């Protein structure tokens, strides 16, 4: 996605000097902390601020709204979650120097999983189960609802088909299709909507000491079907982790596991496509995501559902 209006954030080069100038204008007490760019996500460019903070600068049209969502709900969710998550500290308002809202968040220590690996698989499975068990509670009526993700897998067949056609599946296409078709055939979530992170994949979890140590990027947070997060049993955890995860999580019935496994296949194909785009030098491509996606898909296909 790109901005099309003159003077929008996407057309402004975000540099360390700009970040520091904005801090001097709006948060001068933080302006002398060290500033360095670190890996960001789809929607935000990220700058480390000192040792404990991060500045998130929007680079897509939807990013400011996602930041508002995080600022609204993370203070409510974070205190009861068993892993560190970003917490909003300050807000930067639109100005002549930068036309969009930006935020200062706490920094979650650790290395993103797309740049490292989990060596303590059982511990990571238990940790993820504890985290999602704490997150997946009934959400209030005013919680953000389903937008571009969160509905039943059958709603996303067009997207699945696009990813499916775009990557090489090395003779496993029929297996992948069967997993997806089973998810589409699974009964829908009919309980009360629960809080769902919505975007759990290797770039949005961090690792320390060989296990999960934090979860980041809650911009896609919504209230809905927890299967969207349960897919992380295959997308995030190493081989063998899914069975232990579901035993520890203990709240997923067979239909939820079927939906989650199909969504894990969908997410794996997406990671593979983004890796492929990165290898080809295309905009938005992420070379490190290709191997992560292929490994995740192998885990999806190497299990009978658990």
What is each model feature region?
Residues 1-28:
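Juxta-kinase regulatory segment immediately upstream of eukaryotic protein kinase catalytic domains
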Residues 7, 32-155, 165-171, 175:
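ATP-binding pocket architecture of kinase catalytic cores
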Residues 23, 46, 55, 74, ...:
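Generic structural signal for small/hydrophobic residues in well-ordered secondary structure
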Residues 50, 100, 191-193, 211:
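Conserved catalytic motifs of the protein kinase core domain
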Residues 62-65, 193-196, 201-261:
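Active-site Asp-x-Gly
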Residues 116, 163-194:
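ATP-dependent phospho-/nucleotidyl transfer catalytic cores
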Residues 220, 232-306:
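Helix-rich C-terminal or lid/interface subdomains of diverse kinases
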């Amino acid at each position: 996605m790109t901005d099309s209006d003159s003077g929008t954030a996407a057309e402004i080069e975000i540099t360390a000097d700009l970040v520091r100038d904005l801090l001097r204008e709006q948060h001068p007490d933080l302006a002398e902390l060290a500033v360095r760019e670190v890996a960001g996500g789809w929607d935000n460019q990220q700058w480390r601020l000192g040792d404990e903070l991060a500045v998130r600068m929007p680079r897509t049209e939807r990013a400011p709204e996602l930041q508002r969502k995080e600022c609204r709900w993370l203070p409510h969710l974070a205190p009861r979650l068993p892993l560190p998550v970003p917490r909003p500290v300050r807000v930067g308002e639109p100005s002549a120097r930068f036309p969009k809202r930006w935020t200062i968040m706490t920094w979650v220590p650790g290395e993103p999983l797309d740049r490292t690996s989990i060596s303590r698989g059982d511990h990571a499975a238990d940790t993820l189960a504890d985290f999602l068990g704490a997150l997946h509670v009934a959400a209030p009526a005013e919680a953000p609802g389903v937008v571009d993700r969160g509905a039943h897998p059958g709603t996303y067949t067009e997207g699945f088909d696009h990813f499916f056609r775009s990557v090489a599946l090395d003779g496993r296409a029929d297996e992948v299709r069967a997993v997806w078709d089973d998810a589409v055939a699974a009964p829908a979530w009919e309980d009360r909507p629960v809080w769902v992170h919505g975007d759990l994949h290797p770039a949005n979890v961090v690792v320390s000491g060989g296990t999960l140590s934090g979860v980041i990027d809650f911009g896609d947070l919504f209230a809905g079907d927890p299967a969207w997060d349960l897919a992380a049993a295959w997308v995030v955890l190493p081989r063998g982790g899914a069975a232990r995860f579901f035993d520890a999580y203990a709240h997923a019935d067979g239909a939820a596991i079927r939906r989650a496994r199909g969504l894990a296949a969908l997410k794996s194909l997406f990671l593979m496509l983004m890796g492929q785009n990165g290898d080809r030098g295309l905009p938005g491509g992420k070379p490190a995501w290709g191997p992560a996606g292929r490994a995740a898909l192998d885990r999806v296909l190497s299990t009978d559902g658990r």
